[in-house]
Amino acid sequence: MITYEIPCLLGLEKLVADEIKRLGLADVRAENGRVLCQGSWADCARLNINLRCGARVVALLGQFPARSFEELFQGVRAIPWEEFLPREAAFPVKGYSISSQLHSVPACQSIIKKAVVERLKAHYGMEQFPETGTKYQIRFSVFKDQVSIGLDASGEGLYKRGYRAVGVEAPLRETLAAALVTLSRYRGRDPFCDPFCGSGTIPIEAALIAKNRAPGLDRRFDAQKWAFLPAEAWMDAADEAQDREFHGQYDIWGGDIDPRAVDIARDNARKAGVDDCVRFEVADAAQFHRDSTYGQLVTNPPYGERLLERQEAEQLYRAFGKAWRTLPAGWRTLVLSSHTEFERCFGKPADKKRKLYNGMIKCDVFMYGNV
């Protein structure tokens, strides 16, 4: 059995753990900023293709305490790297250190690299390694003097689904958008709306969830090139995911006041294969209105990080709050914002609040209705 580490944004650990449990993996444990689980090498493909809220998939090869560089070196050298890295492999090292004696990340990277090379030298009988072949990204973390080290199976982060327009930076990563939709308990039955849709990330993730479409079907992963991981594992995982897809009629809507953003959102929906069930329109959130008895509203309005922008954001929240109060009582609403005065401006205290991080920005999810 392999131990997998799924890093995630702080606050999303339970959602990621629930996703992994639904995939049937064993010994699922949520910790701060990551979830650990046990599975086979075939599960590496299943995790990468299916996870909506996790940041990446790391196959852990070693966990040990280290308070000195010598302990770090010996711990890394004890791992059977030759079972995973062919002689021509490229094996760069990335990682971080928090609350540990070994606080210098560059020094840790250097020691880890040296230890792996020494292990491979002994096995392959080579003095130098060209690193011209397939990439096997080594990832490590040192947290409170405990080292976790393994191979990054994902490559680019799992938020890169493959549908976002090149060169367009969204304020909300796809993994966090999927988490917000999941928190709203949307399952595809009721109307779903995002009146500040921007490039369409939240409505597109809602459509993928409604269709039960795996988010990783349209991209590549680093581990697909690993010599020890059979290609059939990826084909089987993709087939399994496609067999679970739903085909129905969905009422998913996104609006934005910026026509260019709406054009990008429509293009992204087409690339994601959900343009048949998501409508995007140029619309003013201050005029938002719906008559249906039930529905979900999930949105990420502008925060306004600078003073003038904050004042504009507050005016926007007031206007949106006034429109929102016309919604029928059966609607569930989730608003992600870092603005400390959101509830006052919106005009109603949240029924529930949940702390999340949007990248490095500390935010609250303000929840209204039966959430």
Q: Regions from the language model: what does each represent?
A:
Residues 284-287, 291-371:
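C-terminal catalytic and target-recognition region of SAM-dependent MTase-like enzymes
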Residues 149-185:
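SAM-dependent Rossmann-like transferase core, predominantly class I methyltransferases
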Residues 138-154, 366:
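C-terminal edge-of-domain segments
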Residues 8, 256, 337:
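Short beta-strand/turn micro-motifs composed of small residues
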Residues 1-134:
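Non-catalytic nucleic-acid substrate-recognition regions in nucleic-acid-modifying enzymes
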Residues 98-101, 157, 302-306:
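A short, flexible beta-alpha/helix-coil linker loop
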Residues 172-290, 305-306, 310-314:
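Conserved S-adenosyl-L-methionine
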